[in-house]
A protein has these predicted regions:
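Catalytic core of carbohydrate-active enzymes
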Residues: 421-429, 443-444, 451-461, 468-694, ...
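Solvent-exposed beta-strand/loop surfaces of large extracellular or lumenal domains
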Residues: 66-79, 337, 601-621, 725-755
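C-terminal low-complexity, glycine/proline- and small-hydrophobic-enriched intrinsically disordered tails
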Residues: 630-877
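Aromatic- and carboxylate-enriched substrate-binding clefts and catalytic-loop regions
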Residues: 253-517, 552-554, 562
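A low-complexity, Ser/Thr/Gly/Pro-enriched, surface-exposed linker/loop concept
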Residues: 47-87
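Catalytic and substrate-binding clefts that recognize carbohydrates or anionic sugar/phosphate headgroups
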Residues: 84-222, 231-232, 244-249, 552, ...
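Short, well-ordered beta-strand segments enriched in hydrophobic/aromatic residues
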Residues: 44, 52-54, 91-98, 573-576, ...
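Bacterial N-terminal signal peptides
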Residues: 7-17
Length: 878
């Protein structure tokens, strides 16, 4: 309804158009003071101390219009010195020295060089140098890709960063944009247009400066970080409702509903389709509702919105507007098509065509209730009317800016493939139809993080994969679960299996791992405040939420070698488990590198892992490993959040042990375009000493529409011993096992004091102090969380195993003395170390028990118990 009202207002005040798209304060023409002319044929523009535009023109005419990539060259002019003679020009900034020998031939290794430092060593670049050390960027699509085996059609493209310290962006043949931000051809002449990024290993700085000239990566609406449900399958509106209802009935949240192409008439599309005059399968393009499945689209959208969902429809627009489409007459009238009865070719790069397309074809569907579009362009890469213009890029540009201009009250976004440099301005990304293999799962973290090298930070993958090789395969519960666990730490959380009866993603079809899947969904929703923080940082700095380790550790070789690992925001080291568990123990083992500079807290096991080491670590299917920097503070949602339509009133602050730390927590309204200026920041700090922990929440700074004056808190202090008392703003609050607001409790399974506070004024300082008993250390609790959670998960299988032989006998006393430790702590939290000491004393006894004669359990289950309970703990203590 909100979007409908916005649309009606626009229609009353303006004629529909997409040419008025804007990029804020972007000014394509550089400040004259940044420009250096060198003879009659060369021009250099000093954009930053390490970024220089280098142009050579045969006729001495240079280009000041925006290109598809570079839209803003009017930056603050850096300090630089120019030395000119009739034969040579030298430009020296604080970081680089450019030398050009004046002449009438294009740039080459003899007449141009740029000197700078990389990791303290002198680097010299000249034209034609090998760029094999480039750290790469991304590609248009992962269609048909198995693992890292890119197709020849869509190879991984070069990025803006290199181990050699430089990267060249050749903008020579890129299309331009006119004063209305519409596509314009470059003059055909002898001309070179290069940008050198000479940042050495200052990778984050290079990306920040890239956004100055190419535009920021917009902040998507908060709701887009929830679960996207999608399947290429023929569904009716009532079937879609049933699926959403069933997902929610088993406690799986959903925020985005994607309706694939069967929403429209497919005109008899089958496995041997008839082709139209454009070489496309008849029925692949469509704009006419398939009324047998969707008899009342407005009612379907009303239900979806009432259910808190955003919706999208799939588009394959390559076949233009066909005479059999319901919108044909309306489009022809708006466009002025003078060949009635003949199809109108797709021509998105013609302004008149694009305007008519939106007004006559798409906007009526939006008025029915559709929220955004999935642009599933898979056809010819370049325009038939502007050779060299990427259809993917221009579709994204037009659709995004149309939404931005015509729905000013809402934050625009679409779902699409990568169209080349500059595509970061149009979130979000669809990575395509991948092959379902363990190798594809393993590659997606690397691919996603590497895409940060061109600031493309919002890839959405088909979690679980899209299709089997040759459409022949069998779903695997463990693999799908591991994919969902990885997806928690990816930009978008989406499934999308292909149209095949063997490709199904209904969680209830995987009972053996259903609970682990549900836990992954819940963790994703808990992580959204942290994710949204990282998304804002992408907007501010140009660093995507998933980025390679070498951004932070550029001189460490492991940062380039461990490609399955990546940073998820600034405080979380993430990975994926892309191997099946051992057939006997169920444990999957991965190699991990923990960067130097701080320790890392394993959120799965509770172990504190020293930085500067590699480890071989085993995890069960119940474990989803992620590692937080010691001392960090992770903002989270409480465990009950199942929708992102509105922000939760309760903020969970998870304080990680091992060091002091801080957090800047970002908030805005989550939906509008006003986030550039209307937002708040809340600064949080934790300070730890031997016998106390102090968490300080400073008054909120800033404002945005609809913000509240108070909030509730759930403050969790991971792996911290039971306090002797807890003070809130200097006043002691009581302990309660089942705590309410104004009380604290002890979460024994996480070994964490938890403080609950309600209606805390956000404009006042909040101080929470844990006074800890002397004589013992929190480090004695490290790695116990893993034992507790594994015992909790394996106790029932243990009972079942033993019950096959004797259903009346108790579990072994050696096991119970270990597994029941958290229950003892919950009953008597002040006696925590008594029970922890008992566990540590009894663990060797349990190991001896497993080594002896145990007729009630099989050798295989003994091995499983040992691997889960004993070996994992011993490994984490190293």
């Amino acid at each position: 309804m909100k979007r409908l009202l916005s649309t009606l207002i626009v229609l009353l005040v303006a004629v529909l158009g997409v040419s008025a798209a804007s990029f804020g304060s972007a000014v394509p023409r550089a400040n004259d003071k940044a420009v250096v002319l060198a003879g009659s044929n060369a021009r250099f523009t000093v954009l930053t101390p390490q970024l220089i535009r280098m142009e050579w023109s045969e006729d001495g005419v240079f280009e000041d219009r925006a290109s598809l990539t570079f839209i803003n060259r009017n930056l603050d002019v850096p300090q630089f010195k120019v030395t000119k003679t009739s034969k040579k020009v030298v430009i020296k900034t604080s970081d680089v020295t450019l030398t050009y020998h004046v002449g009438n031939v294009p740039f080459n290794e003899s007449n141009l060089k740029v000197e700078f430092l990389t990791a303290g060593q002198k680097t010299v670049w000249t034209p034609g140098m090998d760029d094999s050390a480039n750290l790469m960027g991304t590609t248009r699509t992962l269609d048909n890709v198995d693992g890292s085996k890119h197709t020849a059609k869509d190879p991984l493209e070069k990025g803006l960063l290199s181990r050699d310290g430089w990267a060249i962006v050749d903008d020579t043949n890129k299309y331009l944009m006119d004063e209305n931000w519409w596509v314009a051809p470059r003059p055909q002449k002898g001309y070179v247009d290069w940008y050198i990024f000479a940042y050495g290993h200052q990778y984050k700085k290079a990306l920040a400066d890239y956004t100055k000239v190419s535009g920021k990566a917009p902040l998507p609406p908060r709701q887009t970080f929830g679960y996207w449900w999608s399947r290429y399958w023929q569904y009716s509106d009532s079937e879609l409702k049933d699926i959403i209802d069933r997902l929610r009935s088993i406690d799986i949240p959903v925020d985005i509903l994607i309706i694939d192409m069967d929403w429209h008439e497919t005109w008899g599309l089958d496995k041997d389709p008839e082709l139209d005059e454009y070489g496309q399968r008849i029925g692949w393009t469509g704009y006419t509702w398939q009324k047998e499945l969707f008899p009342a689209p407005e009612q379907m959208f009303t239900w979806a919105h009432d259910a808190g969902l955003k919706t999208a429809l799939n588009l394959h627009p390559a076949s233009g507007i066909q005479p059999y489409e319901e919108c044909y007459d309306r489009f022809c009238k708006e466009y002025g098509w003078d060949q009635p009865g003949k199809s109108v070719p797709f021509k998105i790069d013609e302004k008149k065509w694009a305007d008519a397309y939106y007004k006559a074809v798409l906007q009526p569907i939006e008025l029915q209730g559709n929220d955004f579009w999935w642009l599933d362009w898979q056809q010819w890469k370049e325009s038939k009317y502007n050779p060299g213009l990427s259809n993917t890029f221009w579709l994204n540009h037009v659709f995004y800016n149309y939404a931005k201009e015509n729905y000013p009250g809402l934050r625009p976004f679409l779902y699409h493939r990568w169209g080349g440099l500059g595509s970061h301005r149009y979130p979000l990304g669809f990575s395509g139809d991948t092959i379902i293999t363990w190798e594809s799962l393993e590659y997606q973290p690397e691919f996603t993080a590497t895409s940060a090298n061109v600031n493309y930070g919002y890839w959405g993958h088909d979690l679980g994969g899209h299709m089997f090789h040759g459409h022949k395969g069998v779903e695997n519960a463990e693999r799908y679960t591991r994919w969902l666990q990885y997806g928690v730490f990816s930009p978008l959380y989406k499934i999308h299996p292909t149209k095949h009866p063997d490709c199904k993603r209904y969680p209830w079809l995987f009972p053996e791992t259903l609970f682990q899947m549900i836990e992954a969904f819940h963790l994703r929703y808990a992580m959204v405040p942290y994710i949204y923080n990282a998304a804002r940082k992408n907007y501010d700095t140009g660093v995507a939420m998933c980025y390679p380790l070498y951004y932070d550790y550029p001189e460490t070789e492991e940062a380039y070698q461990y490609k399955r690992q990546f940073m998820f925001g600034d405080d979380i080291l993430a990975t994926c488990i892309a191997v099946p568990g051992d057939e006997v123990t169920g444990v999957a083992t991965i190699d991990m590198w923990f960067p130097e500079g701080n320790d890392w807290f394993d959120m799965a096991s509770g172990a504190m892992l020293k930085g500067g080491q590699t480890r071989n670590i085993g995890y069960t299917i119940d474990d989803n490993p992620w590692y937080t920097k010691a001392g960090s503070i992770i903002p989270m949602n409480p465990s009950h959040v199942r929708s992102l339509k509105t922000a939760c009133d309760t903020l969970v602050l998870t304080a990680i042990p091992g060091a002091d730390g801080h957090l800047s927590y970002y908030e805005d309204d989550g939906v509008s375009q006003n986030y550039d200026k209307e937002y708040t920041i809340t600064k949080v700090a934790q300070k730890r000493s031997e016998n106390n922990v102090v968490l300080t929440v400073s008054p909120r700074e800033g404002q945005y529409a609809g913000m509240k004056d108070t909030r509730s808190y759930e403050l969790r202090f991971m792996c911290t011993r039971t306090p002797s008392k807890v003070l809130v703003n200097g006043v002691e609050i009581p302990y309660a096992r089942y705590a309410k607001s104004g009380q604290w409790t002890y979460d024994a399974y996480n070994l964490a004091p938890v403080v609950y506070l309600k209606d805390v004024p956000v404009n006042e300082t909040l101080t929470v102090e844990l006074v800890l008993p002397e004589g013992r250390s929190d480090s004695e609790l490290y790695a116990l969380k893993g034992i507790f959670s594994r015992c909790k998960n394996i106790s029932e299988p243990y009972k079942n195993e033993q019950g096959l032989r004797d259903r009346r006998i108790m579990l072994s006393i050696e096991y119970l003395k270990v597994s029941q430790c958290p229950n003892f702590i919950m009953a008597d939290p002040q006696g925590i170390f008594k029970y922890v000491d008992d566990l540590k004393a009894n663990l060797p006894e349990f190991e001896k028990y497993l080594q002896g004669e145990t007729p009630l359990i099989s050798d295989g289950f003994k091995a499983r118990l040992k691997a889960h309970v004993v070996d994992g703990y011993k490994e984490n203590l190293k």
